[in-house]
């Protein structure tokens, strides 16, 4: 089987998992998430472990391929190699997304943005983010449901939530308001992000 896909996902105390058909619901202290898997993947929750595997008929077909190659005296393919490319891809993706859900509802995800530039600052306006970025007007960003935004200091923004993809998406959207420019490095960047600098034109 796929090295990633075949691994069961341990579900820690404090989190609950419900499986109904192709739908996985995970609930924990950081929130609640839902994932609908493609038809080629079957989820299972047992003994505090969540697993996702190819559908039964696909497993049988892959095993038939292995047996046929073995009967011919050939070196048999691995289980993953016996699956279609589409099934392999969806298997690994489904496992990764399910693992991210469990991690998200128990520990959560966060990204920190830094504002670099004279006069650039961030502050909260209720639950919305207010940004001064050198424009003639302030920028107001409304946090989507399930995402928390904080501005502990004027040059720092913390984005957190249970959904890893949503946290990353919000960080990307905020960065777009003032991407780091390559000459002076001014703009909004991820904490620790390297901004490649260009040398300005010499007079």
UniProtKB/Swiss-Prot annotation:
Species for this entry: Hyphomonas neptunium (strain ATCC 15444)
GO biological process: cytoplasmic translation
Matching Pfam families: Ribosomal_L6
Tree of life domain: Bacteria
Keyword Ribonucleoprotein part of the UniProt annotation: yes
Name recorded for this polypeptide: Large ribosomal subunit protein uL6
An annotated GO cellular component: cytosolic large ribosomal subunit
InterPro entries: Ribosomal_uL6-like, Ribosomal_uL6-like_a/b-dom_sf, Ribosomal_uL6_a/b-dom, Ribosomal_uL6_bac-type, Ribosomal_uL6_CS
Known function: This protein binds to the 23S rRNA, and is important in its secondary structure. It is located near the subunit interface in the base of the L7/L12 stalk, and near the tRNA binding site of the peptidyltransferase center.
Keywords linked to the UniProt accession: Ribonucleoprotein, Ribosomal protein, RNA-binding, rRNA-binding
């Amino acid at each position: 089987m796929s090295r990633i896909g075949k691994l069961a996902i341990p579900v820690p105390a404090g989190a609950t998992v419900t499986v109904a058909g192709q739908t996985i619901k995970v609930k924990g202290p950081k929130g609640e998430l839902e994932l609908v898997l493609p038809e080629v993947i079957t989820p299972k929750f047992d003994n505090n472990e969540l697993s996702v595997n190819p559908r039964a008929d696909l497993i049988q077909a892959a095993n038939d391929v292995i047996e046929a190659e073995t009967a011919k005296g050939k070196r048999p393919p691995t289980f993953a190699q016996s699956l279609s490319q589409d099934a392999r891809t969806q298997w690994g993706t489904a496992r990764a997304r399910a693992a991210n859900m469990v991690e998200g509802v128990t520990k959560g995800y966060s990204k920190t943005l830094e504002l670099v530039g004279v006069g650039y600052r961030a502050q909260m306006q209720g639950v919305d983010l207010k940004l001064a970025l050198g424009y003639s007007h302030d920028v107001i960003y409304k946090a989507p449901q399930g995402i928390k935004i904080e501005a502990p200091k004027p040059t720092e923004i913390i984005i957190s939530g249970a959904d890893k993809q949503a946290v990353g998406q919000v960080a990307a959207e905020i960065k777009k308001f003032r991407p780091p420019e390559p000459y002076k490095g001014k703009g909004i960047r991820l904490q620790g992000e390297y901004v490649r600098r260009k040398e300005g034109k010499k007079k």
